[in-house]
């Protein structure tokens, strides 16, 4: 029997965030997530989906002839077969990224994958789910992301940046304002005032298409 994954959608669009923001990318959105962040913009991926073989997923990805592939969710690592999918995507020559909540062990993920680890802030309502052991595994190919809901979240993220030396461990540290919760101009001003070694990140796809699935 072939390995399978439960998939919500596979689509081709522009990457809205991370270091490849603005670049055409194929997104493979896996179904299911053990977290319930209060600002989640992909709750439609919590359940449902279609059970598909890895071969069928790879075939669809190849049909777009992409350079970049992003495996996202939900929480992709909640499905064990995400690990072989990531490896096979790398073997096929794509530049692969993984968007993960940071609540699950990333050690088995192929080192060629850029792991985008989302450290949950107090404002997410899931801060207790952070797996800080993952920080020791970060390399220059990886990225750490904070979604910030308030000044309190910002101060918390700065404390973690300093405590763990995140800018020395990961290739990028990304600060994003939670949509409709934190004013992006305020966040920009705070980053400049504190001279932080982080990248301000806005979700390009929301500016272009709001929260339309498949975009």
Predicted regions span which residues?
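A secondary-structure boundary/capping signal
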Residues: 29, 72-73, 203
